[in-house]
Amino acid sequence: MTSPSSRSVRPGSVVRTVRRHRGGRSATVQDMVAAEMPVAFIYNGVPFAVMMATPEDLEDFALGFSLSEGIVDHAQDLRVIAVETFLEGASLQIEIPPERAAALHQRRRNLDGRSGCGVCGNESIEAVLRVPPVLQSSLQIDVDALAHALDALHARQPIAAQTGAVHAAGWADAQGNVQLVREDVGRHNALDKVIGALARARIDASHGFAVVTSRASFEMAMKAAQARIPLLAAISAPTALAISLAESAGLTLIGFARDHDCVVYSHPQRLDLGVAVGEPA
């Protein structure tokens, strides 16, 4: 709960009074910490899910979550998005076509108290492990473009720079020029916000690639594939299930992406490393 002595710096961060011990000295100082609040998704007046999230770019979050979860297939399927903010949380009032709402409310969700969640609440293992339509993108990038995108992503994380407590996701074109960056306490949320921002800007996600400051979990790979992003690069490792999904969905999955180094786990044809297969790099 926000104390009277705290002041908001920006929606994604707040200032707290802390006791810092460093180099054998202790002092009372002002420190920036990441903001986090419950965000309720309400479709056609019916509550659907509550996510713990950073209270920035919530319109992008509403659209991106709806697309990556398969609630709607196209941005125009969301008729109205209204954001209502309160002292301790926010609600996203979303209107979708009646037939979509009827299908949605058959799905039972249990997302309370989570910082992002990609598969929570599905009613069967089969529903969780569904494979999106296979990606057919002709995208190809080189390792310089990937390194350029990673550098730009690092430079465009103001909340992380202030607090050290959030994830970031970005989308870059084939030359590695980062067009969009979003931050959130939840890695899934950050990617959802990018997906929503792409849709709102009417940018074809298949013409570029996503970079994230987290591991590449199954949920992250699923969201990228569902959004028709053909390549996902993470600075940390993927999971085995994420690799299996990427192989089946036609997604190029890259891990340990740092500077000009990386490991390609699936569909390597989209990344030109500049060396022959088997040649020492």
From Swiss-Prot:
Query: Which InterPro entries does the UniProt record give?
Result: Cytidine_deaminase-like, FdhD
Lipid metabolism: present as a keyword of the record? no
Recorded GO MF terms: sulfur carrier activity; sulfurtransferase activity
Spell out the GO cellular component terms annotated for this protein, sorted alphabetically and separated by semicolons: cytoplasm
Keyword vocabulary terms for this entry:
Cytoplasm, Molybdenum cofactor biosynthesis
The answer to whether UniProt assigns keyword Cytoplasm to this entry is: yes
UniProt main location, coarse? cytoplasm
Residues of the active site: 117 (cysteine persulfide intermediate)
UniProt subcellular location: Cytoplasm
Q: Which GO terms describe its biological process?
A: Mo-molybdopterin cofactor biosynthetic process
What domain of life does the native source organism fall in? Bacteria
- Give the Pfam families listed for this entry: FdhD-NarQ
NCBIfam families under this entry?
fdhD_narQ
Question: Which purpose does this protein serve, as stated in its record?
Answer: Required for formate dehydrogenase (FDH) activity. Acts as a sulfur carrier protein that transfers sulfur from IscS to the molybdenum cofactor prior to its insertion into FDH.
Family according to the record? Belongs to the FdhD family.
Protein name according to UniProt = Sulfur carrier protein FdhD
Q: What is the species listed in this Swiss-Prot or TrEMBL entry?
A: Xanthomonas axonopodis pv. citri (strain 306)
Upper classification of the organism:
Bacteria, Pseudomonadati, Pseudomonadota, Gammaproteobacteria, Lysobacterales
Name of the coding gene: fdhD
